[in-house]
Amino acid sequence: NASDRGEEDSFRNHCQKEFHLKWLRDAESSAWIAPRSLRFEEDMQRDVFHAITGPTMAGGPSGHKRGFPYTWLPNHLLDGRAQVSPRSFCAALRRAVEDNVPDDWPYPLHYKAIQAGVQEASRIRVDEITREDYPWVQKVMEPLFGRVTVPCESYEFTSLWAQDKTVDKLRSQDESVKLPPQHLEEGPTGILKDLQELGLVQILRDGRIQMPDVYRVAFGLGRKGGVKPLK
């Protein structure tokens, strides 16, 4: 709509004025082509991104200790294979722009809105996995909701599964479950192996389990100093 086009024009004009970035328009499609330096130079990408978000993930002189938005956002969207889904990145930013900016914040996006964006991206990603691809994942994560803080020892997962009789439940419905765990016959160890192969968890060098934020937040697991899990 006209409002969106006006915002797009403002963004391009700001890029040209502040960063000397000239946008060209494709003659056939009329699409705007991002300047080469904005596509390939990380320093330029960071500067433009921080012109939108501000330079830190917290206010005050020590805000840098919480991280820098340009790296903080993708780092919190990484899966266990060290990959970021473009859909998750766009979902996080789409959610972030919905929040009102505090009067004393001089940038279009506030760091708390970016954190809320990660929560939304996590909700969407987990919903995709549990509803569309691997419904059994929801069943193995439900007993852990609100009861585990990562990184943690593997027994914190397996003991809760034992209390919930998760493995028995999966075995009883194995034939009816779409894409059941491949290593279910190995019990809890096999389930952990499947979660790791899907990129949902990581096994650290010391044997503890870590879960990327893009999954952890929606699955309701805690992490000290991390984005708050959904309730």
Predicted regions and their residues:
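C-terminal leucine-rich, beta-strand-based interaction scaffolds used for sensing/assembly
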Residues: R36-K231
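The catalytic "switch" region of P-loop NTPases
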Residues: N1-H64
